Amino acid sequence: KFDADKLVKMIPQEYADFRTDVLENHGIDAPELREIDTGGSSFAQNTQSDGAKALLDVAFKHPIKIIANALGVPPDWMIQMGKDNDCKVAALLGTAEHAINQVKAGVDILVVSGTEAGGHCGSVSTMVLIPEVHQAIQPYGDVPILAAGGIVTGKQMAAAMAMGASGAWCGSVWLTTIESEVEPVIKEKMVAANSSQTVRSRSRTGKHSRQLVTPWTQAWEADSAPEPLPMPLQPMVAEPALQKVNKLAAGGHE
């Protein structure tokens, strides 16, 4: 059973002090962050079976045609829920070994994500990974591949299909659209950033994820910084702080 209070007790005070100091060093007064609470625990709850099932129950009340699982092979019950609701099950992955495991588990679509991808990603580049996965899964069946990771333009999509993909899976680009819930100031930073202004960092979730280089990511790279905690503890450290930053940024705080 999910117990947010138990997770809170697993987070050392050092982490609450560190996140608070990072914000205060950049002119943000956040004394409340020196106390660890259950803020940010919804992420942890949603990674548990009960939380995931509750989300899928809501999702399947709508006419969706695909669900996607990440950070591991989807459990049998999730794949079965997809079949029962005439919905394809996709899996995000970052290595050829992961691709084979996903095909054996019975997923319908492989979203093969290179290290250029925003969010959680591995260390293998898209150009290397797509043909490697395409070749690796041949003995196990004809499962379509969607290439992901640094793909925005038609030229990039065409290149992905030339390497064996059936299509492309775009993610970060949609965060900059009018329909996106991302704050306008963050959208502007994303559009303005070049390819050298992102970093794979464990500072947000405890697992490597690509994000914009910010004072937050830089602080966690410092020699004096504590080692990021494993998932789901690190999100409980990071999310309350980052949500405060986003709120202030939306209000004009630099």
Pin down the residues of each PLM region.
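Conserved active-site-proximal phosphate/metal-binding subdomains
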Residues: 2-19, 120-146, 152-254
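Active-site entrance/lid segments in N-terminal catalytic domains of soluble metabolic enzymes
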Residues: 1-140
